UniProtKB/Swiss-Prot annotation:
Highest taxon in the source lineage: Bacteria
Alphabetical list of Pfam families matching this protein: GrpE
The protein's name in its UniProt record: Protein GrpE
Chief localization: cytoplasm
Gene name of this polypeptide: grpE
Cellular component terms (Gene Ontology): cytosol
């Protein structure tokens, strides 16, 4: 036992630890509260940033595919013009030339709005863009490649609008 300073008696300290300072306890409590508030603020900031990105992506997709319905309804018009050109043959005539110019202008306007024509003759069959309606034999075309196109397909900004209806070369 320390007679000069009884408050420093090691036996007494071991048995009765000094009470923690109430200010220290409050400081620790406030520090943990600050840590929680900071974590919440970071989480909210991340959520807000994710929401901004999602909204920007949705706006971009809405802009890219705003014409989808209109262009989809024009596909039968493209088919009719293409069939008319095929029926008109290759002989030049004012009617055929006018039909050809109209078809090309319409395709250009559609392409300027993100439409891409799929005319896959001779290309490998792609189930993501083509719909096989039959198999056939064709000289000079490898098996698994498109022999004939019954109906052209279309992509709108790299998303399939309508698959091409095709005949695929038979496997040996």
């Amino acid at each position: 036992m320390n007679q000069d300073h009884p408050e420093f008696d090691s036996e007494d300290l071991a048995q009765n630890p000094p009470e923690t300072d109430p200010l220290k306890a409050e400081i620790e409590s406030l520090r943990s509260e600050i840590a929680l508030v900071k974590a919440d603020a970071l989480r909210e900031r991340a959520d807000l940033e994710n929401q901004r990105k999602r909204i920007a992506r949705d706006v971009e997709n809405a802009r890219k595919f705003a014409n989808e319905k209109l262009l989809g309804e024009l596909l039968p018009v493209f088919d009719s013009l293409d069939a008319g050109l095929t029926a008109a043959g290759t002989q030049p005539s004012p009617l055929r030339d006018g039909l050809d110019m109209t078809y090309k202008q319409l395709l250009k306007v559609a392409a300027d709005n993100g439409l891409t024509l799929l005319d896959p003759v001779g290309q490998p069959f792609n189930p993501d863009q083509h719909q096989a309606i039959s198999q056939g034999e064709a000289e000079g075309i490898a098996p698994g490649h498109v022999v004939q196109v019954f109906q052209k397909g279309y992509l709108l900004n790299d998303r399939l609008l309508r698959p091409a209806l095709v005949v695929v070369a038979k496997q040996d």
